[in-house]
Amino acid sequence: MLVRAAVLGLLTVLALVCAHPTPAAAADGDVSWRVRTGANAYGDDRSSFSYAVNPGGTVEDTMVVTNRGKAPLRLAVYASDGYTTDAGQLDLLTRDKKSTGVGAWTRPKVTAVTVAPGKSADVPFTVTVPENATPGDHVGGLLTSLEQADTAAGINVDRRLGLRVAVRVGGELKPRLAVEDVQLDYHGSAGPFSKGSATVTYTVHNTGNALLSGRQEVAVRGPFGWLRTAADDLPDTPALLPGERWKVTVPVADVAPGVRLTATAKLLPLLTDASGSTTPLKPVEASAGAWAVPWTLALIVLLLIAAVTAIVLLARRNRTRRKAREAALVRDAVKAAMG
């Protein structure tokens, strides 16, 4: 179950069942309700709504709303498109935002439902896929909503509780992930023989038409593949909808300053079907380079070279002077012998 909250004059709490068959529930004081999938030909114990539909096709299903409070409960009912948040979780557009996908295709038979205390009510709905719908995965949700005034905070509280609606539209499925905008920054150490660290950033872009996550590998290496260092324990990317992007920042420790470094970000795309099984696809990767000059060591080497050069020049000068003195002594001795 996923719970998200946002306060912008309107506080929204959204619960989406994404992986577990436990019904989604909301509770606040004496107000409490839950939602679950109806038991029918699609299944008796589903975690969410999931369909495979051809363009122009229609499916009918039911969401069940249960009032667990002590007073009658009236809830608004509507559908909305899904998207991946900056935190990597699925959320749904608020009611004031226009939906163009699953949120527009999903039509509940009622726009509001009143449920007696301790009772349940069925909310039938239809999902109609347009003839011109793009093949592939589309995600949204069917929501119940209760708006209450919070006089202490001076805002309205819109509590939303819903279930995910996933639709795979028939046609050619093209699952593709791309690694884009790879950048490498090296952070050296003051020690002449110490290793530094690197920061690798890149963007994961779902360029296909299927819902995909990716298993990540990041490594930094020197020339000819030497001095390779890999990042440890990278989590999988969140499941991205077609067209979505996810920015990644990976720190890599203990990187040797190999003068010219190359960072490679590699992704193993993971395709999950309606049954929950995962299929790995062909890996994709991209690289970027950066300079990593060990300046302290370079300075020491330059000083050593300068010192050796000075010693050699001084020795050469002394040798020249000694030879000149010896030649003068020889000349003087010859003159004395002949005089």
Residue spans for each PLM region:
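Membrane-proximal extracellular "stem/stalk" segments
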Residues: E172-A306, V312-R317
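Terminal connector regions
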Residues: A71-K98, D122, T128-R176, V255-I300
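Beta-sheet-dominated interaction scaffolds and their linkers
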Residues: R34-G69, A112, V179-K195
